[in-house]
Amino acid sequence: DIVASIESRGFIFAGTIARDLSLPFVLARKPGKLPNKTYRKSFNLEYGSTSIEIQKNTKIDKDHKIIIVDDLVATGGTAIACAELFTKNFNISKSNILIVCVIDLPDLGGSNLIAKRGYQIKTLMEFWFNLKIFYSIYNWVL
């Protein structure tokens, strides 16, 4: 019933999906970017913390099904925060929310955490990397 997206790279995919399916498009944005009163959810990232917001006047019924689209799932914090904005403020059931990400970084555990929190998640591709090799290159560069 609704396509939602997380700022900003998710907009690229979600806008097209919403247009092609003729569905409303809801933006989850950084604080202060939306014109009306908002619901806010703070969360942790792999490198700090931040918040996202959704407008309070968004027309969402508790029975609506929502697809949340983003480009990447790493730790899962952003997607979970967005999903919780809908479950806590619009009384959307977790079973009515599907999180769709283009890329999954499974080594960081985000997709597993999303599933453990009770949300459905689908990804188009997984990108595995060897942390030991990554850190050896990183330390060599420094």
Task: Go through the PLM ranges and name each one.
Residues 12-21, 83:
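Short Gly/Thr/Asp-enriched flexible loops that form oxyanion-binding sites at enzyme active sites
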Residues 81-142:
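PRPP-dependent phosphoribosyltransferase catalytic core
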Residues 22-67, 138-139:
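Short, glycine/charge-rich flexible loops or terminal/linker lids adjacent to PRPP-binding catalytic cores
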Residues 70-80:
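Acidic, divalent-metal-coordinating active-site segment for phosphoryl/phosphodiester hydrolysis
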Residues 10-14, 107-108:
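Short, well-ordered alpha-helical microsegments
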Residues 1-7, 97:
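Short glycine-rich phosphate-binding loop at a beta-alpha junction
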Residues 5, 68-69:
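Generic enzyme active-site microenvironment
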